Each structure stands twice: as C-alpha cells, then as structure tokens.
Swiss-Prot record:
This is Hemoglobin subunit beta. Involved in oxygen transport from the lung to the various peripheral tissues. Gene3D superfamilies: Globins. The modification Phosphothreonine is found at residue 12. Heterotetramer of two alpha chains and two beta chains. Coiled coil: none annotated.
Amino acid sequence: VHLSGEEKAAVTGLWGKVDLEKVGGQSLGSLLIVYPWTQRFFDSFGDLSSPSAVMSNPKVKAHGKKVLTSFSDGLNHLDNLKGTFAKLSELHCDKLHVDPENFRLLGNVLVRVLACNFGPEFTPQVQAAFQKVVAGVANALAHKYH
C-alpha cells in the first residue's frame, strides 16, 4: 500500500488511540450482524441469535481484538502486507474456506466503526487513508486465493 507521509501519519496517529478490544469487538460484531452469513465461520462462539447477543458475546470481543492486533502488525509493515498476512491468508483460504470478499466487508465495517468512535477526528483525509489500508490488507489476505 502506498501512503504519503501525511497519510501514514494520519493512520498511525489515530490507530495509536484505538482500543483494540472495544473497536475489534464492535467491528467483528457489526460484520456478524450486517452480514449474517459470516456467522457460519464462528459456530464455536455460542449465542449469536440476536444483535445484542452478538455484541455482548465475549468470544466475539476476544476474536475482534485478535483481528485488530493482526491489523496492527500490518500497519507496521505497509510495504509488505502480502508477507505479513501470508500465513493468515493460507489459513483462511485452505483451512477455513472463508470467501475473500469477507475481508473487504470487514475492512469497510472497521472504517465505519472508527468513524463512529472518533467523530470529527476521523476527517475525510483520515478516512481516505484508512480505506487504502483496509483495501491493501483485504488484498493481502485474499492473496492465497489467486
């Protein structure tokens, strides 16, 4: 992903303020609610029967944090996203059989959750920079599918 110096500063500056557990749980929870077919990958998470059950589910929150922790690794290696996410791409492709379109959906949900959490601080410039990053991460995660 090619980001200008300003874009990198915007992304890393905001990301440093992100509560990974809170935003991760909100992002994964929102994905599971808005795109309910994604729930099939999380059979072991227990009750996902309603929006409130999803959003209060501790396994959703924990996995959301895990997802954003990996995303943080990507932010530290923007010039090598494919390498950074190679093992996760392989896992999601070969073992979990996740449709790679779900990575794009989760990226878009993450951008929306960040906007909700940071309000005016999430300027159009910050949003544009994050869109580039989530697109790059989604592409890297889909790499093994090609």
